[in-house]
Curated annotation (Swiss-Prot):
Keywords, alphabetical: Acetylation, ATP-binding, Cytoplasm, Cytoskeleton, Hydrolase, Methylation, Muscle protein, Nucleotide-binding, Oxidation
Pfam families noted in UniProt: Actin (PF00022)
Name of the protein in question: Actin, aortic smooth muscle
UniProt entry tagged with the keyword ATP-binding: yes
Domain of life: Eukaryota
Main location: cytoplasm
Amino acid sequence: MCEEEDSTALVCDNGSGLCKAGFAGDDAPRAVFPSIVGRPRHQGVMVGMGQKDSYVGDEAQSKRGILTLKYPIEHGIITNWDDMEKIWHHSFYNELRVAPEEHPTLLTEAPLNPKANREKMTQIMFETFNVPAMYVAIQAVLSLYASGRTTGIVLDSGDGVTHNVPIYEGYALPHAIMRLDLAGRDLTDYLMKILSERGYSFVTTAEREIVRDIKEKLCYVALDFENEMATAASSSSLEKSYELPDGQVITIGNERFRCPETLFQPSFIGMESAGIHETTYNSIMKCDIDIRKDLYANNVLSGGTTMYPGIADRMQKEITALAPSTMKIKIIAPPERKYSVWIGGSILASLSTFQQMWISKQEYDEAGPSIVHRKCF
Protein backbone atom coordinates (compact mmCIF):
# COMPACT_ATOMS: atom_id res chain seq x y z
CA MET A 1 0.00 0.00 0.00
CA CYS A 2 1.34 3.44 -0.83
CA GLU A 3 1.35 6.11 1.85
CA GLU A 4 -1.24 8.44 0.37
CA GLU A 5 -3.88 5.71 0.57
CA ASP A 6 -3.93 6.09 4.35
CA SER A 7 -7.54 7.15 4.56
CA THR A 8 -8.66 7.28 0.96
CA ALA A 9 -12.38 6.62 0.70
CA LEU A 10 -13.50 3.23 -0.60
CA VAL A 11 -16.22 3.03 -3.22
CA CYS A 12 -18.24 -0.16 -3.39
CA ASP A 13 -20.96 -0.51 -6.02
CA ASN A 14 -22.96 -3.61 -5.19
CA GLY A 15 -24.82 -4.71 -8.27
CA SER A 16 -27.09 -7.73 -8.62
CA GLY A 17 -24.55 -9.34 -10.94
CA LEU A 18 -21.16 -7.77 -10.30
CA CYS A 19 -19.62 -6.05 -7.31
CA LYS A 20 -17.32 -3.16 -8.25
CA ALA A 21 -14.91 -1.96 -5.57
CA GLY A 22 -11.97 0.41 -5.46
CA PHE A 23 -10.54 3.68 -4.19
CA ALA A 24 -12.06 7.14 -4.60
CA GLY A 25 -10.10 9.20 -7.10
CA ASP A 26 -9.22 6.20 -9.29
CA ASP A 27 -10.68 6.18 -12.79
CA ALA A 28 -11.76 2.52 -12.68
CA PRO A 29 -12.61 -0.01 -9.97
CA ARG A 30 -9.65 -2.15 -8.77
CA ALA A 31 -11.86 -5.17 -8.22
CA VAL A 32 -14.79 -6.39 -10.27
CA PHE A 33 -16.14 -9.77 -9.31
CA PRO A 34 -19.46 -11.62 -9.53
CA SER A 35 -21.84 -11.01 -6.60
CA ILE A 36 -22.09 -14.73 -5.96
CA VAL A 37 -21.73 -16.91 -2.91
CA GLY A 38 -21.29 -20.62 -3.66
CA ARG A 39 -21.72 -23.57 -1.32
CA PRO A 40 -20.56 -27.13 -2.07
CA ARG A 41 -23.21 -29.47 -3.48
CA HIS A 42 -21.28 -32.60 -2.56
CA GLN A 43 -19.57 -34.08 0.48
CA GLY A 44 -15.81 -33.46 0.61
CA VAL A 45 -13.85 -36.73 0.59
CA MET A 46 -10.22 -35.62 0.38
CA VAL A 47 -8.63 -34.68 3.67
CA GLY A 48 -6.32 -31.68 3.76
CA MET A 49 -7.80 -30.07 0.64
CA GLY A 50 -8.63 -27.00 2.69
CA GLN A 51 -12.23 -27.06 1.51
CA LYS A 52 -14.32 -24.12 2.65
CA ASP A 53 -18.00 -24.04 3.44
CA SER A 54 -18.50 -21.09 1.12
CA TYR A 55 -16.77 -19.40 -1.80
CA VAL A 56 -17.22 -15.83 -3.04
CA GLY A 57 -16.89 -14.14 -6.42
CA ASP A 58 -14.41 -15.45 -8.99
CA GLU A 59 -13.43 -18.41 -6.82
CA ALA A 60 -17.08 -19.47 -6.64
CA GLN A 61 -17.29 -18.95 -10.41
CA SER A 62 -14.25 -21.15 -11.12
CA LYS A 63 -15.50 -23.97 -8.88
CA ARG A 64 -19.08 -23.58 -10.11
CA GLY A 65 -19.30 -27.19 -11.30
CA ILE A 66 -19.41 -28.46 -7.70
CA LEU A 67 -21.21 -25.54 -6.07
CA THR A 68 -24.71 -24.18 -5.76
CA LEU A 69 -24.46 -20.51 -6.69
CA LYS A 70 -26.65 -17.91 -4.99
CA TYR A 71 -26.94 -14.20 -5.68
CA PRO A 72 -27.61 -12.24 -2.45
CA ILE A 73 -28.82 -9.21 -4.42
CA GLU A 74 -32.02 -9.71 -6.38
CA HIS A 75 -33.51 -6.99 -8.56
CA GLY A 76 -30.98 -4.53 -7.16
CA ILE A 77 -32.10 -5.08 -3.58
CA ILE A 78 -30.18 -7.06 -0.96
CA THR A 79 -32.24 -10.08 0.11
CA ASN A 80 -29.66 -12.23 1.90
CA TRP A 81 -27.70 -10.26 4.48
CA ASP A 82 -25.40 -13.06 5.66
CA ASP A 83 -24.18 -13.66 2.13
CA MET A 84 -23.97 -9.93 1.49
CA GLU A 85 -21.70 -9.60 4.49
CA LYS A 86 -19.46 -12.27 2.96
CA ILE A 87 -19.30 -10.26 -0.27
CA TRP A 88 -18.36 -7.04 1.53
CA HIS A 89 -15.80 -8.93 3.60
CA HIS A 90 -14.35 -10.39 0.41
CA SER A 91 -14.14 -6.98 -1.28
CA PHE A 92 -12.39 -5.31 1.65
CA TYR A 93 -10.02 -8.03 2.80
CA ASN A 94 -9.34 -10.18 -0.28
CA GLU A 95 -9.78 -7.85 -3.23
CA LEU A 96 -8.76 -4.38 -2.00
CA ARG A 97 -6.70 -5.71 0.93
CA VAL A 98 -7.66 -2.86 3.22
CA ALA A 99 -8.90 -2.58 6.78
CA PRO A 100 -12.38 -1.03 6.48
CA GLU A 101 -12.05 0.57 9.93
CA GLU A 102 -9.48 2.96 8.41
CA HIS A 103 -11.47 4.15 5.38
CA PRO A 104 -14.70 6.10 4.84
CA THR A 105 -16.87 3.92 2.60
CA LEU A 106 -19.33 4.97 -0.11
CA LEU A 107 -21.97 2.34 -0.94
CA THR A 108 -24.56 2.46 -3.70
CA GLU A 109 -28.21 1.50 -3.72
CA ALA A 110 -31.04 1.04 -6.18
CA PRO A 111 -33.50 3.93 -6.53
CA LEU A 112 -36.62 3.33 -4.41
CA ASN A 113 -34.64 0.99 -2.14
CA PRO A 114 -36.76 0.06 0.92
CA LYS A 115 -35.91 2.20 3.95
CA ALA A 116 -35.16 -0.81 6.14
CA ASN A 117 -32.52 -1.89 3.61
CA ARG A 118 -30.55 1.34 3.87
CA GLU A 119 -30.66 1.11 7.64
CA LYS A 120 -29.39 -2.46 7.61
CA MET A 121 -26.53 -1.51 5.25
CA THR A 122 -25.60 1.35 7.56
CA GLN A 123 -25.74 -0.90 10.61
CA ILE A 124 -23.54 -3.61 9.08
CA MET A 125 -20.95 -1.06 7.93
CA PHE A 126 -20.63 0.57 11.35
CA GLU A 127 -21.11 -2.48 13.58
CA THR A 128 -19.54 -5.34 11.64
CA PHE A 129 -16.85 -3.52 9.68
CA ASN A 130 -16.38 -0.55 12.05
CA VAL A 131 -15.99 1.98 9.23
CA PRO A 132 -15.13 5.52 10.42
CA ALA A 133 -17.71 7.06 8.08
CA MET A 134 -20.06 5.99 5.29
CA TYR A 135 -22.56 7.25 2.75
CA VAL A 136 -25.21 5.62 0.57
CA ALA A 137 -25.71 7.09 -2.92
CA ILE A 138 -28.31 6.29 -5.57
CA GLN A 139 -26.75 4.43 -8.49
CA ALA A 140 -28.34 6.35 -11.37
CA VAL A 141 -27.34 9.71 -9.89
CA LEU A 142 -23.71 8.57 -9.80
CA SER A 143 -23.90 7.56 -13.48
CA LEU A 144 -25.06 11.04 -14.36
CA TYR A 145 -22.15 12.58 -12.40
CA ALA A 146 -19.79 10.30 -14.30
CA SER A 147 -21.09 11.67 -17.61
CA GLY A 148 -20.32 15.20 -16.41
CA ARG A 149 -23.93 16.31 -16.08
CA THR A 150 -26.25 17.37 -13.29
CA THR A 151 -29.47 17.25 -15.34
CA GLY A 152 -30.67 14.36 -17.47
CA ILE A 153 -32.59 11.11 -17.42
CA VAL A 154 -30.60 7.97 -16.73
CA LEU A 155 -31.59 4.56 -18.03
CA ASP A 156 -29.69 2.31 -15.66
CA SER A 157 -29.97 -1.35 -16.55
CA GLY A 158 -27.83 -3.92 -14.83
CA ASP A 159 -28.22 -7.60 -14.08
CA GLY A 160 -31.16 -7.44 -11.73
CA VAL A 161 -33.19 -4.32 -12.35
CA THR A 162 -33.73 -1.47 -14.81
CA HIS A 163 -34.59 2.07 -13.76
CA ASN A 164 -35.40 5.36 -15.43
CA VAL A 165 -34.31 8.14 -13.13
CA PRO A 166 -34.89 11.78 -14.12
CA ILE A 167 -32.46 14.10 -12.37
CA TYR A 168 -32.66 17.88 -12.31
CA GLU A 169 -29.73 19.94 -11.01
CA GLY A 170 -28.43 16.92 -9.10
CA TYR A 171 -31.73 15.91 -7.48
CA ALA A 172 -33.46 12.67 -8.44
CA LEU A 173 -37.21 13.26 -8.94
CA PRO A 174 -38.69 10.34 -6.99
CA HIS A 175 -42.27 10.72 -8.27
CA ALA A 176 -41.09 10.13 -11.83
CA ILE A 177 -38.71 7.20 -11.25
CA MET A 178 -39.73 4.11 -13.21
CA ARG A 179 -38.64 0.68 -12.13
CA LEU A 180 -38.70 -2.36 -14.38
CA ASP A 181 -37.85 -5.77 -12.95
CA LEU A 182 -36.38 -6.91 -16.22
CA ALA A 183 -32.64 -6.83 -16.76
CA GLY A 184 -29.58 -8.87 -17.65
CA ARG A 185 -30.46 -11.93 -15.60
CA ASP A 186 -33.89 -12.20 -17.21
CA LEU A 187 -32.32 -11.86 -20.64
CA THR A 188 -29.89 -14.66 -19.78
CA ASP A 189 -32.81 -16.85 -18.67
CA TYR A 190 -34.70 -16.03 -21.85
CA LEU A 191 -31.66 -16.88 -23.97
CA MET A 192 -31.43 -20.22 -22.12
CA LYS A 193 -35.05 -20.84 -23.04
CA ILE A 194 -34.79 -19.95 -26.73
CA LEU A 195 -31.54 -21.92 -27.07
CA SER A 196 -33.35 -24.97 -25.73
CA GLU A 197 -35.86 -24.55 -28.58
CA ARG A 198 -32.88 -25.01 -30.87
CA GLY A 199 -32.05 -28.22 -29.02
CA TYR A 200 -29.24 -26.94 -26.82
CA SER A 201 -29.96 -27.68 -23.19
CA PHE A 202 -28.65 -25.43 -20.43
CA VAL A 203 -30.05 -26.07 -16.96
CA THR A 204 -27.71 -25.77 -13.98
CA THR A 205 -26.56 -22.54 -12.35
CA ALA A 206 -23.12 -23.24 -13.84
CA GLU A 207 -24.52 -23.59 -17.37
CA ARG A 208 -26.41 -20.35 -16.94
CA GLU A 209 -23.02 -18.62 -16.62
CA ILE A 210 -22.04 -20.05 -20.03
CA VAL A 211 -25.22 -18.65 -21.56
CA ARG A 212 -24.46 -15.28 -19.96
CA ASP A 213 -21.11 -15.33 -21.77
CA ILE A 214 -22.82 -16.17 -25.09
CA LYS A 215 -25.19 -13.25 -24.50
CA GLU A 216 -22.37 -10.81 -23.75
CA LYS A 217 -20.30 -11.88 -26.75
CA LEU A 218 -22.92 -12.36 -29.48
CA CYS A 219 -26.17 -10.52 -28.79
CA TYR A 220 -27.14 -7.16 -30.28
CA VAL A 221 -30.21 -4.93 -30.60
CA ALA A 222 -31.90 -4.78 -34.01
CA LEU A 223 -32.87 -1.34 -35.33
CA ASP A 224 -35.98 -2.87 -36.90
CA PHE A 225 -36.96 -6.18 -35.31
CA GLU A 226 -39.33 -7.41 -38.05
CA ASN A 227 -36.80 -6.68 -40.81
CA GLU A 228 -34.05 -8.42 -38.88
CA MET A 229 -36.27 -11.50 -38.34
CA ALA A 230 -36.93 -11.64 -42.10
CA THR A 231 -33.21 -11.36 -42.87
CA ALA A 232 -32.40 -14.11 -40.38
CA ALA A 233 -35.05 -16.39 -41.91
CA SER A 234 -33.90 -15.91 -45.50
CA SER A 235 -30.12 -16.10 -45.09
CA SER A 236 -27.46 -17.33 -42.71
CA SER A 237 -25.60 -14.00 -42.70
CA LEU A 238 -26.54 -13.32 -39.08
CA GLU A 239 -25.42 -16.70 -37.73
CA LYS A 240 -22.47 -16.96 -35.38
CA SER A 241 -20.86 -19.94 -33.71
CA TYR A 242 -19.74 -20.32 -30.11
CA GLU A 243 -17.44 -22.93 -28.61
CA LEU A 244 -18.59 -24.42 -25.31
CA PRO A 245 -16.04 -25.31 -22.58
CA ASP A 246 -16.09 -28.97 -23.68
CA GLY A 247 -15.20 -28.14 -27.28
CA GLN A 248 -18.71 -28.57 -28.69
CA VAL A 249 -19.63 -25.76 -31.12
CA ILE A 250 -23.14 -24.32 -31.20
CA THR A 251 -24.65 -21.99 -33.79
CA ILE A 252 -26.91 -19.09 -32.91
CA GLY A 253 -28.93 -16.98 -35.35
CA ASN A 254 -31.98 -14.85 -34.65
CA GLU A 255 -31.52 -15.56 -30.91
CA ARG A 256 -28.75 -12.95 -31.07
CA PHE A 257 -31.24 -10.09 -31.34
CA ARG A 258 -34.40 -11.84 -30.07
CA CYS A 259 -32.84 -11.97 -26.60
CA PRO A 260 -32.27 -8.21 -26.02
CA GLU A 261 -35.47 -7.33 -27.96
CA THR A 262 -37.19 -8.29 -24.68
CA LEU A 263 -36.08 -4.92 -23.29
CA PHE A 264 -38.35 -3.24 -25.85
CA GLN A 265 -41.03 -5.95 -25.81
CA PRO A 266 -41.29 -7.45 -22.30
CA SER A 267 -44.23 -9.58 -23.49
CA PHE A 268 -41.55 -11.92 -24.91
CA ILE A 269 -41.04 -13.23 -21.37
CA GLY A 270 -44.69 -12.89 -20.39
CA MET A 271 -44.32 -9.55 -18.63
CA GLU A 272 -47.17 -7.08 -18.81
CA SER A 273 -44.97 -4.05 -18.89
CA ALA A 274 -43.95 -1.21 -21.18
CA GLY A 275 -40.56 -1.51 -22.90
CA ILE A 276 -37.56 0.60 -21.88
CA HIS A 277 -38.31 3.22 -24.54
CA GLU A 278 -41.85 3.68 -23.21
CA THR A 279 -40.80 3.75 -19.55
CA THR A 280 -38.25 6.45 -20.47
CA TYR A 281 -40.98 8.47 -22.19
CA ASN A 282 -43.44 7.93 -19.31
CA SER A 283 -40.83 9.00 -16.81
CA ILE A 284 -40.14 12.22 -18.73
CA MET A 285 -43.90 12.91 -18.97
CA LYS A 286 -44.20 12.65 -15.18
CA CYS A 287 -41.76 15.54 -14.83
CA ASP A 288 -42.55 19.22 -14.91
CA ILE A 289 -43.26 20.49 -18.41
CA ASP A 290 -40.43 23.05 -18.17
CA ILE A 291 -37.66 20.50 -17.69
CA ARG A 292 -38.71 17.88 -20.25
CA LYS A 293 -36.67 19.47 -23.02
CA ASP A 294 -33.50 19.12 -20.93
CA LEU A 295 -34.29 15.49 -20.18
CA TYR A 296 -34.95 14.56 -23.83
CA ALA A 297 -31.60 16.10 -24.77
CA ASN A 298 -29.74 14.19 -22.04
CA ASN A 299 -30.70 10.51 -22.11
CA VAL A 300 -27.78 8.79 -20.41
CA LEU A 301 -27.37 5.01 -20.67
CA SER A 302 -25.70 3.19 -17.81
CA GLY A 303 -25.09 -0.38 -16.65
CA GLY A 304 -24.02 -3.63 -18.30
CA THR A 305 -27.36 -4.33 -19.98
CA THR A 306 -27.02 -1.14 -22.03
CA MET A 307 -23.80 -2.50 -23.59
CA TYR A 308 -25.54 -4.26 -26.52
CA PRO A 309 -24.38 -2.97 -29.89
CA GLY A 310 -27.23 -1.05 -31.55
CA ILE A 311 -29.09 -0.12 -28.37
CA ALA A 312 -28.43 3.65 -28.58
CA ASP A 313 -29.64 3.92 -32.20
CA ARG A 314 -32.74 1.92 -31.37
CA MET A 315 -33.52 4.09 -28.32
CA GLN A 316 -33.07 7.21 -30.47
CA LYS A 317 -35.51 5.82 -33.03
CA GLU A 318 -38.12 4.70 -30.48
CA ILE A 319 -38.07 7.86 -28.36
CA THR A 320 -38.18 10.08 -31.45
CA ALA A 321 -41.37 8.25 -32.45
CA LEU A 322 -42.96 8.91 -29.04
CA ALA A 323 -41.81 12.49 -28.41
CA PRO A 324 -43.16 15.71 -29.96
CA SER A 325 -41.79 16.02 -33.49
CA THR A 326 -39.83 19.23 -32.86
CA MET A 327 -38.04 17.88 -29.81
CA LYS A 328 -34.27 17.42 -29.94
CA ILE A 329 -33.43 13.97 -28.64
CA LYS A 330 -29.97 12.83 -27.69
CA ILE A 331 -28.91 9.45 -26.34
CA ILE A 332 -25.58 9.48 -24.52
CA ALA A 333 -23.88 6.10 -24.37
CA PRO A 334 -20.46 6.54 -22.71
CA PRO A 335 -18.04 3.70 -23.61
CA GLU A 336 -17.29 3.07 -19.92
CA ARG A 337 -20.98 2.86 -18.96
CA LYS A 338 -20.55 -0.64 -17.56
CA TYR A 339 -18.79 0.97 -14.61
CA SER A 340 -20.20 4.51 -14.70
CA VAL A 341 -21.97 4.09 -11.34
CA TRP A 342 -18.65 3.24 -9.72
CA ILE A 343 -16.84 6.05 -11.57
CA GLY A 344 -19.49 8.53 -10.40
CA GLY A 345 -18.98 7.28 -6.84
CA SER A 346 -15.24 7.74 -7.19
CA ILE A 347 -15.77 11.33 -8.39
CA LEU A 348 -18.28 12.14 -5.64
CA ALA A 349 -16.24 10.69 -2.76
CA SER A 350 -13.15 12.65 -3.78
CA LEU A 351 -14.88 16.06 -4.03
CA SER A 352 -13.82 18.44 -1.27
CA THR A 353 -17.40 19.69 -0.97
CA PHE A 354 -18.59 16.15 -0.28
CA GLN A 355 -16.45 15.65 2.82
CA GLN A 356 -19.06 17.16 5.15
CA MET A 357 -21.71 14.77 3.78
CA TRP A 358 -20.28 11.57 5.27
CA ILE A 359 -22.18 9.94 8.15
CA SER A 360 -19.56 9.62 10.88
CA LYS A 361 -19.32 6.81 13.42
CA GLN A 362 -20.10 9.39 16.11
CA GLU A 363 -23.33 10.49 14.40
CA TYR A 364 -24.31 6.85 13.99
CA ASP A 365 -23.67 6.09 17.65
CA GLU A 366 -25.84 9.05 18.65
CA ALA A 367 -28.75 8.57 16.25
CA GLY A 368 -28.71 4.90 15.19
CA PRO A 369 -29.31 3.47 11.69
CA SER A 370 -32.11 5.94 10.85
CA ILE A 371 -29.45 8.67 10.47
CA VAL A 372 -29.05 7.43 6.88
CA HIS A 373 -32.40 8.94 5.82
CA ARG A 374 -31.41 12.35 7.13
CA LYS A 375 -27.94 12.44 5.60
CA CYS A 376 -28.36 10.59 2.31
CA PHE A 377 -31.05 11.52 -0.16
